[in-house]
């Protein structure tokens, strides 16, 4: 046996040292001290960041919500059924991110951005933090482009602009979700990506919404995020932030997005539940002191960006449920003060057959007027006042039987205008058709039509226009203003239709 030379031995040792890799993974690890109701108290993670994602040895994940001197309060995603005292937890040193971009469009996701529609994984390399700073004043531009909902009462009286936050508020079962879904359906062909965030809804309700969006071809440009009533409070709390992160991607890439939060009352309740378990002091209505801040930091991320930033926009339609019409409760008043206006839906109107049940007296759009097209402004300029006077007159007629001719005429026209503003669900109307029917009502073309037949008159008018005078609709659509020639033509068309219309 030949002996190894000294030089060979040293070269072999040298080679071994060069190729030696120390496979060592450094991790900060803590232990679960207690776990209850989706919140874990952890000892031993001193360097953890606020809202950092933590990993449990059971495979569960959570975020650090409470940073105390000797422990960390962690909100666990899901129910964490296998977590118990003594379970190891390690840091990931990253904040929570969700997938963004065109890869998520057309999908149904949970609050963590994971697909729940059975269509396979989301293939994307683009992720965004769920907590981002809202754009500053200098990065914004005033709202000036319309975002049409296709609902006559909204587009005429409480117009919404791209980059606006418009609250939809009302009692249970007054058609709040329907208004939001109509707005999403109406964005077809408008290059607007829509995000619907369901918070604490029944699974069956969300399935119905997805079915409706698919039926009207709206899922092609929509994302649905679902944190249902059966999900944990943590998932319900995180869902809107995941949704807005996805919307911000389009806003920041010079595109337009619309986000619906359905609804923020349940979001506040989920946050209240988490805060109680984290032993944070309760305030008014037992909500924690920072409940205003969780909604303001969410809604401030909706904005119209300036030209230097690409002029993209993110429009928000938060929904809030009231109890017995009480808009002075804590959460409704908070969100009213954060948003740029509200659409108020009333139970009494809903049950009296006025649908959408929008109370035009209490509904307001603080910045949308600048975004409304001129043609709509021209036909609906006095509509709010006319409807207010009609309501006053209607209340007066309950006590007085004798009315002069002018009052009778005003009352009759008011009744017809109320009928004009009625609309079936899931049937948004293009703005040019809205202009035509509101013009017909405001200028007295419906005065000779019986109140019960106004809806029928409208249903027959639109096909007549499309068949015989499509150029009128086309001109309103392109010009966006009723000039003298166009108005004269519109009058002629309406007079001709009245001759052919039979009740």
UniProtKB/Swiss-Prot annotation:
Belongs to the ATPase alpha/beta chains family. GO terms for molecular function: ADP binding; ATP binding; proton-transporting ATP synthase activity, rotational mechanism. This is ATP synthase subunit alpha. Produces ATP from ADP in the presence of a proton gradient across the membrane. The alpha chain is a regulatory subunit. The gene is atpA. It is an enzyme of class 7 (translocase). Its EC number is 7.1.2.2. It comes from Helicobacter pylori (strain J99 / ATCC 700824). Coiled coil: none annotated.
């Amino acid at each position: 046996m030949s002996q190894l030379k000294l030089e060979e031995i040293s070269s072999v040792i040298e080679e071994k040292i060069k190729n030696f890799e120390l496979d060592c993974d450094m991790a900060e690890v803590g232990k679960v001290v207690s776990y209850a109701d989706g919140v874990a108290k952890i000892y031993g993670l001193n360097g953890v960041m606020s809202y950092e994602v933590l990993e449990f040895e059971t495979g569960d994940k959570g975020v650090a919500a409470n940073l105390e001197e000797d422990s960390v309060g962690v909100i666990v995603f899901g129910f964490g059924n296998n977590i118990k005292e003594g379970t190891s937890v390690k840091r990931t040193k990253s904040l929570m991110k969700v997938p963004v971009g065109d890869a998520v469009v057309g999908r149904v996701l949970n609050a963590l951005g994971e697909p729940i529609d059975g269509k396979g994984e989301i293939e994307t390399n683009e992720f965004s933090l769920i907590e981002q700073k809202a754009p500053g004043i200098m990065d914004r531009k005033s709202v000036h482009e319309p975002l049409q909902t296709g609902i006559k009462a909204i587009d005429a009286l409480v117009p919404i602009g791209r980059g606006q936050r418009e609250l939809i508020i009302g009692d249970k079962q007054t058609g709040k979700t329907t208004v939001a879904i109509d707005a999403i359906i109406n964005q077809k062909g408008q290059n607007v990506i829509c995000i619907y965030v369901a918070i604490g809804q029944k699974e069956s309700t969300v399935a119905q919404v997805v079915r409706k969006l698919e039926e009207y071809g709206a899922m092609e440009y929509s994302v649905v995020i679902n944190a249902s009533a059966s999900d944990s409070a943590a998932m319900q709390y995180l869902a809107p932030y995941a949704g807005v992160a996805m919307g911000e991607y389009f806003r920041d890439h010079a595109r337009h997005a619309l986000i619906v939060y359905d609804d923020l009352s349940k979001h506040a309740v989920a946050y209240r539940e988490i805060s109680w378990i984290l032993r944070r002091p309760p305030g008014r209505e037992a909500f924690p002191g920072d409940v205003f801040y969780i909604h303001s930091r969410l809604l401030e991320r909706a904005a119209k960006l300036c030209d230097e930033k690409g002029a993209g926009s993110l429009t928000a339609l938060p929904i809030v449920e009231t109890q017995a019409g009480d808009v002075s409760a804590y959460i409704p008043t908070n969100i009213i003060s954060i948003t740029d206006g509200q659409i108020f839906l009333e139970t009494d109107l809903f049950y009296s057959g006025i649908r959408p049940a929008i109370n035009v007296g209490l509904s307001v759009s603080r910045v949308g007027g600048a975004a409304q097209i001129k043609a709509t402004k021209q036909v609906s300029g006095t509509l709010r006042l006319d409807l207010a006077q009609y309501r006053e007159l209607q209340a007066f007629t309950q006590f007085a039987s004798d009315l002069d001719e002018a009052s009778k005429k005003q009352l009759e026209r008011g009744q017809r205008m109320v009928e004009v503003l009625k609309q079936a669900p899931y049937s948004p109307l293009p703005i040019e058709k809205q202009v035509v029917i509101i013009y017909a009502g405001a200028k007295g073309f419906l005065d000779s039509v019986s109140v019960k037949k106004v809806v029928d008159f409208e249903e027959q008018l639109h096909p007549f226009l499309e068949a015989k005078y499509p150029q009128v609709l086309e001109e309103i659509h392109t010009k966006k203003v009723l000039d003298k020639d166009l108005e004269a033509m519109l009058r002629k068309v309406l007079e001709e239709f009245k001759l052919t219309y039979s009740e």
